[in-house]
Amino acid sequence: MLADYRLKWGASKLNVYEGPRRGFVGNFLSLTCNAQVQADYYSFSDQDDIWHAEKLEHAMEWLRTVPSDTPALYCTRTLLVNEENRPIGLSPLFQRRPAFENALAQNIAGGNTMVFNNAARQLLLRAGPLVDVAAHDWWVYLAVTACGGQVKYDSRPSLRYRQHNSNLIGANRGLLARLTRIRMLFKGHLKEWNARNIEALGQLRSLMTPPNVTLLSDFIRARDSALFGRIRKFRSTGIYRQTALGNFGMLLAVIFNKL
């Protein structure tokens, strides 16, 4: 199929590369860090996306206001549809500002909504395609905010995302999704993901802003402290999730040493 489209559109518009077969994170980062791919702006996509016609237009309207040497990330909500392309809901609406204090606790948007500039891509190149992170989109959010970049979260959905039983990553909404996250928290998944993200951020430490270097160090110390010290140190970091329920869940994670 891809070969047919390459013939139809021309080799200059569609290139096909062999992936590393290391799961979705390794595959996305392999392509993102491919030296043969050169552009001013980059966007992720997969087979379950149906882009809105104005997606790139809205992204570029904002990205062009950011200096080219400043890492910049545009992301949005998602319109969820079923296998027949019928709308079934929206991804969560987040209203608190995007920041490193938030990125340490969660990702705010799916990679399929993200468009980022070359300065942001240079951060991903610095860490490399083999960096061990929980998710490629969360990693972009972490890298850009850690290094003083700008993030625009647009409440307007930029695409339709098909939901079906074989989705690798769900929509992150509804009671079932919340229960799944709670179960994963108490199984230690969140703590493992944070450990991997912290290790990966070490690759960018020299590019991080001084306040964010301090914040990361405080976060690490809080995770390594005993119960009451952990609670006190964590509260002093200012790290937050986007919702009250999310912050309550994070407090439980701190108390039970699952962060």
Describe every region a protein language model picked out.
Residues 1-174, 255-258:
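Nucleotide-sugar donor-binding/catalytic module of glycosyltransferases
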Residues 129, 133, 139, 162-259:
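C-terminal subregions of glycosyltransferases and related glycan-biosynthesis enzymes
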